[in-house]
Amino acid sequence: MKKHNFSAGPSILPREVIEETAKAILDFNGSGLSVLEVSHRGKDFQAVMDEAVALFKEILNIPEGYSVLFLGGGASMQFCMVPYNFLEKKAAYLNTGVWAKKAMKEAKGFGEVVEVASSADANYTFIPKDFTIPADADYFHVTTNNTIYGTELKGDLDSPVPMVADMSSDIFSRPVDVSKYICIYGGAQKNLAPSGVTFVIVKDDAVGKVSRYIPSMLNYKTHIDGGSMFNTPPVLPIYSAMQTLRWIKAQGGVKEMDRRATEKADMLYAEIDRNKMFVGTAAKEDRSRMNICFVMAPEYKDLEADFLKFATDKGMSGIKGHRSVGGFRASCYNAMPKESVQALIDCMQEFEKLH
């Protein structure tokens, strides 16, 4: 039976990427060695790193003066590194969910944190629109897609101060005006690679301006100067990231990923809105295309476990919603084929007919 992987992350990767990575695990570049055991200082892996960085910049149209880094520690490490490197006195944060809240918590150890707006009182079911960003803030931080609650910023916001963004779950799903940001970061295990590598886009001239001492491993300049090789990088995930970037480029780049994301999300949301058994949880204007969250309608609430089993038996994997929201979550990242979304829709319609 075909499996349809709707997991929120680690998540689905393109089949071609998995196959190429599997080949490299057995024999990397005809070397007779596995990519798991080659030196990160060798010319073969340096070529992988160089290509991954070049493709990253090309696909996102990153301007001159920015570096792309592949680091460890996940987005959670970036919650600390961002204020360590950029927060001198005050930073502004938009609180749209658990991950934004965690980022704010870390930043409070480095200076004043202004929460410009929050949707916590509504369990983060919408993204606040009416707020003022302090003109004297060192930066304004946003989380562009909220995996738990199924909300997404529709494009780049305007800000009177430099912006920082956690794009863990929607990177490469749409065009981005990188020039608006001094830093964009994210865990790669949604739209880019297996878990274990973190991507960071950082504006070179924004680094080195805070007065505090920054430990070497937490200093962006260290990793810019070292080409992401100050310490041993996560070799295998970077290799897979390079293969994913090749795939994105071959498929038509972020414009095509954007088109596909909208098409897949529109299909599933249309069924959620049509089907009497299901209800979407996020405000319609803020609905995420990456993480589609829904619950059983109140009169069918007692059938939630039944639908989960029914869907699982039909090959749907990873659709159980986060514990803070409940219900279901279908994550439709770039590698998710339209056919899998249709399979979930068929499953929902079949369940409806049975009840």
Swiss-Prot record:
Source lineage: Bacteria, Pseudomonadati, Bacteroidota, Bacteroidia, Bacteroidales
Primary localization: cytoplasm
Subunit structure: Homodimer.
Entry's cofactor comment: Binds 1 pyridoxal phosphate per subunit.
UniProt superkingdom: Bacteria
Entries under InterPro entries matching the protein: Aminotrans_V_dom, Pser_aminoTfrase, PyrdxlP-dep_Trfase, PyrdxlP-dep_Trfase_major, PyrdxlP-dep_Trfase_small
Designated name of the protein: Phosphoserine aminotransferase
SUPFAM superfamilies with a match to the protein in the record: PLP-dependent transferases (SSF53383)
Residues annotated to bind L-glutamate: R41
Membrane-spanning residues: none
Reactions mediated catalytically: O-phospho-L-serine + 2-oxoglutarate = 3-phosphooxypyruvate + L-glutamate; 4-(phosphooxy)-L-threonine + 2-oxoglutarate = (R)-3-hydroxy-2-oxo-4-phosphooxybutanoate + L-glutamate
Pathway stated in the Swiss-Prot or TrEMBL entry: Amino-acid biosynthesis; L-serine biosynthesis; L-serine from 3-phospho-D-glycerate: step 2/3; Cofactor biosynthesis; pyridoxine 5'-phosphate biosynthesis; pyridoxine 5'-phosphate from D-erythrose 4-phosphate: step 3/5
EC class name: transferase
GO terms of biological process kind: L-serine biosynthetic process; pyridoxine biosynthetic process
Family per record: Belongs to the class-V pyridoxal-phosphate-dependent aminotransferase family. SerC subfamily.
Gene3D superfamilies xref list: Aspartate Aminotransferase, domain 1, Type I PLP-dependent aspartate aminotransferase-like (Major domain)
GO terms under cellular component: cytoplasm
